Every structure is written in C-alpha cells, then in structure tokens.
Regions:
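Sec-dependent N-terminal signal peptides
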Residues: 4-19
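Sec-dependent signal peptide cleavage junction
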Residues: 18-30, 70-71
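Surface-exposed amphipathic alpha-helical segments
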Residues: 20, 29-31, 37-41, 82, ...
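Secretory pathway targeting signatures of secreted, lumenal, and periplasmic proteins
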Residues: 30-76, 109, 113
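Short, solvent-exposed coil/turn segments at beta-strand boundaries
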Residues: 35, 39, 54-56, 99-101, ...
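Short, surface-exposed coil-to-beta transition loops
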Residues: 44-47, 112-119, 130, 142-145
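Extracytoplasmic/secreted envelope proteins and their assembly/folding machinery
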Residues: 71-78, 143-147
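Signature of long, low-cysteine stretches enriched in small and polar/charged residues
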Residues: 78-125
Length: 154
C-alpha cells in the first residue's frame, strides 16, 4: 500500500512539472499569435520586441530585416544568432512548415538552461521573426508545441 501511495504521489509531481497549459497570446504589433504558458507575464510588447516571462519560461520574439532573404537563408540565420549568444551543445538545425510559415529551430544550452532558437518566415510576405525560448523543468515537447502554434491573425 505504501508503494502504491508513493507511486501516485511521484506520478502527480511529475505530471504537475511536465504538464503545461498553453493559451493563445498575440504580439499586437504584428498580429502574431501563438500558444504560451497560461499566466505568463508580458514584459514588453513593442514593434521591436515581445518578451514573456514566468518561473519556467523566458520567451523572446523579434522582427528581423528580411529584405532579399529566402527560406534557404533561415538555417544559417538561426545558427548565427545562437552562435552570437554563445549557445552551447547546439543540435543540428531542423526545418518545419506551418500553414503560414517556413521555420527552423535548433536546441542548445543558454548558460545553464535548455533553449530553443527559431526563425519563422511568412510564406506570403517574407517577414522574418526570431524566437528564443529558454526554459526549465518542462519537456521539449511543450516548447515544440509552442513553436508549432504560430499563426498570423487574418
């Protein structure tokens, strides 16, 4: 009976740490909507930057100059941004497509915390956004859900 109780308590603790409720949030300057952790605080919402923060996540979005840029430039761009920030243990760059975006990401370690660095390019207008998500105590799948939820408001 003690083992069962201990197992249930351990499972509940694990689920509370790994489960993350996500809700839509919008960067108003660009009408860029994505799923973010419920209750996360918006630190900055300007035309240059959108910053979100809570105990588990630090999410930063920036609009980049995309003149003459193509989707083939995205892997080199995200790698360069990660190198500039001295991200360690970088994975290979992975590509993904969303309904309105071409995207790339890589994972690594920013100082001591795991992170994802990503770039999204709109398929129609060619706008480019840089996203960094630094996190702790959550699974990579939660971060990937966030990255795969981006869309432009119609």
């Amino acid at each position: 009976m003690k083992r069962l109780f201990l197992f249930v308590v351990t499972a509940c603790l694990y689920l509370s740490v790994s489960a993350q409720n996500l809700v839509p949030i919008t960067w108003t300057a660009f009408g860029l909507t994505f799923d973010a952790p419920k209750g996360i605080l918006v630190e900055e919402d300007t035309e240059d930057t959108f910053l979100l923060n809570n105990a588990r996540f630090y999410i930063s979005l920036q609009s980049l100059d995309s003149e003459d840029m193509t989707k083939d430039d995205l892997p080199k761009l995200v790698k360069g941004l990660a190198d500039d920030d001295e991200v360690q243990q970088q994975t290979e760059v992975k590509t993904f497509d969303l309904e309105q975006f071409h995207g790339v990401w890589l994972k690594g370690i920013a100082e001591v915390d795991p992170c994802y660095y990503a770039c999204l390019m709109t398929k129609d207008a060619g706008s480019v956004y840089y996203i960094s998500i630094i996190y702790n105590r959550v699974e990579d799948k939660v971060v990937e859900r966030i990255l795969k939820s981006f869309k432009m408001e119609e």
